[in-house]
From Swiss-Prot:
Family, similarity comment: Belongs to the UPF0102 family.
Signal peptide positions on this chain: none
CDD domains: PoNe_Nuclease
Name used for this protein in its record: UPF0102 protein FRAAL5785
One GO MF term attached to the UniProt entry: nucleic acid binding
Length: 120
């Protein structure tokens, strides 16, 4: 997949995830927050929880499921990035959760969204 197509797919997934989470009552605080170590896809408030949400978008299953992409080093990196975000936002809620939203956009059929609360 060309880099531009991959970027467009990622942006599509983040938009779908944002709308899905907002429809469930979450307030988006940050999108694509960046620092020198990397990027957090979504930071949101869900009730009393501060949620760091990784969005994974797939157009098929040949690379494995999206949930399989957020394990080990990737999860550790997201935790480090969350610590950086919290350092810059000292008044954020103290209850923190890490979620993953899986967006599947198959070549045929409807888009599917799966929200894994407390994924890691």
């Amino acid at each position: 997949m060309a880099m531009r197509a991959k970027d467009a797919l990622g942006r599509f997934g983040e938009e779908v995830a944002s709308r899905h989470l907002a429809a469930g009552g979450a307030a988006i605080l940050d999108r694509n927050w960046r620092c020198r170590e990397g990027e957090l896809d979504l930071v949101l408030r869900d009730g009393a929880d501060l949620v760091f949400c990784e969005v994974k978008t797939r157009s098929g299953t040949r690379f494995g499921s999206a949930a399989e992409a957020v394990v080990g080093r990737k999860a550790a990196r997201i935790r480090r990035l969350a610590a950086r975000w919290l350092a810059e936002h000292p008044h954020a809620p103290s209850s923190v959760r890490f979620d993953v939203v899986l967006v599947s956009r198959p070549p045929v059929g409807p888009v599917r969204v799966e929200h894994l609360r407390g994924a890691f």
